[in-house]
């Protein structure tokens, strides 16, 4: 069962492995009991000519049925990369990685940030001073450098990126939650809850946090966009998602040299995709800010 689960995970983030041997050809013809093909060559010269006997094609009982069963014509809307892989397919698989990084990183940052911010804002005093010191130290380190340091410490890999990005984004959440909690805990209903003898955990989780979530939702949308951008940067540097797992940043890394070699679309298309996705989540954050009317 564990092996099947791992296979499903690999298929989701890497794509389904093609077990068939595919040979690109530019021409073919049937000659006697042979299938004669001309292999595709992108250098403007004729490719190698090869003959395949009918005995190799076990699905076809007649050599004339081989083209129908074994030869297919494929179109690549965005072309292929330098390894002959469909760029559109890799882009579609790559968006799964970007969205997964965003969701998991934001989830990790919310868990840590809400917990630390709520504790600091509610208890105050030395507890607040210690937590704010940790927040300020973390805040002073450039985000990308901190992510790179954590990634190098944990090792290259997909899950390491989740943890590294999540551990660098909690400080913003913590500062916002702390400010909200310090304001909300002065409300009369919180004082009433204390008078009724409710414990601190219940007061924080049932009365304070539910009334402090509007700004957190907005910052989460912004953090989602930032996580996608950071992951793309890590993959471009070679310390993010590792091959053969397709990542938009990794696709740019593999093909940025083609910008001056006549095929700039190989790097421009994933770059535009990153820009569009990040912009979309920033617009979502702005819309949430207006809808939730945080300022009022």
Question: Which stretches of residues belong to each language-model region?
Answer:
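Membrane-topology segments of multi-pass transport proteins
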Residues: 1-83
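Alpha-helical transmembrane segments of integral membrane proteins
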Residues: 80-296
């Amino acid at each position: 069962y564990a092996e099947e689960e791992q296979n499903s995970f690999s298929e989701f983030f890497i794509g389904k492995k093609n077990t068939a041997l595919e040979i690109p050809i530019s021409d073919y013809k049937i000659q006697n009991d042979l299938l004669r093909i001309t292999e595709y060559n992108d250098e403007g010269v004729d490719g190698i000519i090869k003959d395949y006997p009918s005995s190799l094609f076990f699905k076809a009982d007649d050599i004339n049925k081989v083209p129908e069963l074994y030869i297919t014509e494929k179109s690549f809307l965005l072309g292929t990369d330098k390894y002959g892989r469909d760029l559109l397919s890799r882009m579609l698989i790559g968006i799964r990685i970007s969205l997964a990084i965003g969701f998991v990183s934001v989830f990790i940052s919310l868990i840590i940030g809400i917990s630390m911010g709520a504790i600091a804002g509610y208890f105050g005093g030395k507890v607040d001073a210690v937590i704010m010191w940790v927040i300020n130290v973390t805040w002073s380190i450039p985000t990308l450098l901190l992510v790179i340091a954590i990634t190098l410490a944990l090792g290259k890999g997909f899950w390491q990126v989740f943890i590294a990005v999540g551990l660098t984004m909690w400080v913003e959440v913590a500062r916002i939650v702390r400010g909200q909690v310090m304001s909300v805990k002065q409300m009369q209903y919180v004082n009433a809850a204390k008078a009724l003898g409710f414990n601190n955990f219940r007061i924080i989780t049932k009365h304070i946090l539910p009334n402090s979530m509007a700004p957190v939702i907005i910052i989460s949308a912004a953090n989602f966009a930032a996580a996608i951008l950071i992951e793309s940067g890590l993959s471009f540097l070679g310390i993010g998602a590792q091959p053969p797992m397709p990542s938009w940043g990794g696709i740019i890394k593999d093909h940025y040299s083609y910008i001056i070699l006549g095929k700039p679309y190989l790097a421009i298309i994933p770059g535009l995709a990153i820009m569009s996705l990040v912009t979309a989540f920033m617009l979502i954050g702005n819309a949430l800010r207006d809808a939730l009317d945080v300022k009022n």
